[in-house]
Amino acid sequence: MAPQAPDREKALELALAQIEKSHGKGSVMRLGDEVRAPISVIPTGSIALDVALGIGGLPRGRVIEIYGPESSGKTTVALHAVANAQAAGGIAAFIDAEHALDPDYAKKLGVDTDSLLVSQPDTGEQALEIADMLIRSGALDILVIDSVAALVPRAEIEGEMGDSHVGLQARLMSQALRKITGALSNSGTTAIFINQLREKIGVMFGSPETTTGGKALKFYASVRMDVRRIETLKDGTDAVGNRTRVKIVKNKVSPPFKQAEFDILYGKGISKEGSLIDMGVEHGFIRKSGSWFTYEGEQLGQGKENARKFLLENGDVANEIEKKIKEKLNIGAVVTADDVLPAPVDF
């Protein structure tokens, strides 16, 4: 027979007191004890993607996975997040396992390359050990690992070319994520893992595509983004950029499976102004009549390219449109380096 209610409450209070004595105050708490503020975020640089994420950007204190085919815009999205974190006064680190980071391109996207911490590790173990130490310092706001596929275990590097190393990388990723997830939550650091696609052999039904590094990252990631290039943007006959679609495949902080489309211009990155025009038209703030775009009676230009240039030259108008869109959709928490909210980690 179950003990009476008062006895159960007393037993629970004793247990909680014992836990606090052993493990410190706050080891166990009731979820309703504290008023939870909105999860603070790092904007992605595209308002369409911020809206698709549901909270106005990438959540702090979480693991994010960005994957997709080659040259789809994965690193560009990550670098824009780095630039936005730095603009808010944050500290960023980039672990360049592929040894392919272009500082000039990063600078064009708004990244402060002088203060960006960069590591080009020799092995996967070294890369993840550096990541763990940086996260545990508590000083980092955003960390990018580019890419999971390039995190080669030491045994594979030191072995012969034809040797079999089944599951080594998956075990390495699983161990690393077990270690860093709690530290991310405590420090409020956002960790972005960029990943590549592979094809499973012999798949008859469903998609044969899969990501590298085993299944651990799929479980630990709070947000997974599938980035695809869907169209080439042209100025006459010259290719000037790509139309990109991002699908939020997994989202623990908002409803998943939303999609966002935006332009990535060669040498310039995500077109914030182009994204504002798309969202402004969709939500009725910008009026499109034929090829003309109008905002509150003021003509932005004929054709999207001219409207984009107008917003680029008139930042106050662009900021006003962005503010109205965010207010209508009720997204976007204030982000400052001094006011980081540790996000709870759920598995």
From Swiss-Prot:
<dbReference type="GO" id="GO:0140664">
    <property type="term" value="F:ATP-dependent DNA damage sensor activity"/>
</dbReference>
<keyword id="KW-0234">DNA repair</keyword>
<dbReference type="GO" id="GO:0006281">
    <property type="term" value="P:DNA repair"/>
</dbReference>
<dbReference type="InterPro" id="IPR003593">
    <property type="entry name" value="AAA+_ATPase"/>
</dbReference>
<dbReference type="InterPro" id="IPR049428">
    <property type="entry name" value="RecA-like_N"/>
</dbReference>
<dbReference type="GO" id="GO:0016887">
    <property type="term" value="F:ATP hydrolysis activity"/>
</dbReference>
<dbReference type="Pfam" id="PF00154">
    <property type="entry name" value="RecA"/>
</dbReference>
<keyword id="KW-0547">Nucleotide-binding</keyword>
<comment type="function">
    <text>Can catalyze the hydrolysis of ATP in the presence of single-stranded DNA, the ATP-dependent uptake of single-stranded DNA by duplex DNA, and the ATP-dependent hybridization of homologous single-stranded DNAs. It interacts with LexA causing its activation and leading to its autocatalytic cleavage.</text>
</comment>
<keyword id="KW-0238">DNA-binding</keyword>
<dbReference type="GO" id="GO:0003684">
    <property type="term" value="F:damaged DNA binding"/>
</dbReference>
<keyword id="KW-0742">SOS response</keyword>
<keyword id="KW-0963">Cytoplasm</keyword>
<comment type="similarity">
    <text>Belongs to the RecA family.</text>
</comment>
<dbReference type="InterPro" id="IPR013765">
    <property type="entry name" value="DNA_recomb/repair_RecA"/>
</dbReference>
<dbReference type="GO" id="GO:0009432">
    <property type="term" value="P:SOS response"/>
</dbReference>
<dbReference type="Pfam" id="PF21096">
    <property type="entry name" value="RecA_C"/>
</dbReference>
<dbReference type="InterPro" id="IPR023400">
    <property type="entry name" value="RecA_C_sf"/>
</dbReference>
<dbReference type="InterPro" id="IPR020588">
    <property type="entry name" value="RecA_ATP-bd"/>
</dbReference>
<keyword id="KW-0233">DNA recombination</keyword>
<dbReference type="InterPro" id="IPR049261">
    <property type="entry name" value="RecA-like_C"/>
</dbReference>
<dbReference type="GO" id="GO:0005524">
    <property type="term" value="F:ATP binding"/>
</dbReference>
<dbReference type="InterPro" id="IPR020584">
    <property type="entry name" value="DNA_recomb/repair_RecA_CS"/>
</dbReference>
<feature type="binding site">
    <location>
        <begin position="68"/>
        <end position="75"/>
    </location>
    <ligand>
        <name>ATP</name>
    </ligand>
</feature>
<dbReference type="GO" id="GO:0005829">
    <property type="term" value="C:cytosol"/>
</dbReference>
<dbReference type="GO" id="GO:0006310">
    <property type="term" value="P:DNA recombination"/>
</dbReference>
<dbReference type="InterPro" id="IPR027417">
    <property type="entry name" value="P-loop_NTPase"/>
</dbReference>
<keyword id="KW-0067">ATP-binding</keyword>
<protein>
    <recommendedName>
        <fullName>Protein RecA</fullName>
    </recommendedName>
</protein>
<dbReference type="GO" id="GO:0003697">
    <property type="term" value="F:single-stranded DNA binding"/>
</dbReference>
<dbReference type="InterPro" id="IPR020587">
    <property type="entry name" value="RecA_monomer-monomer_interface"/>
</dbReference>
<keyword id="KW-0227">DNA damage</keyword>
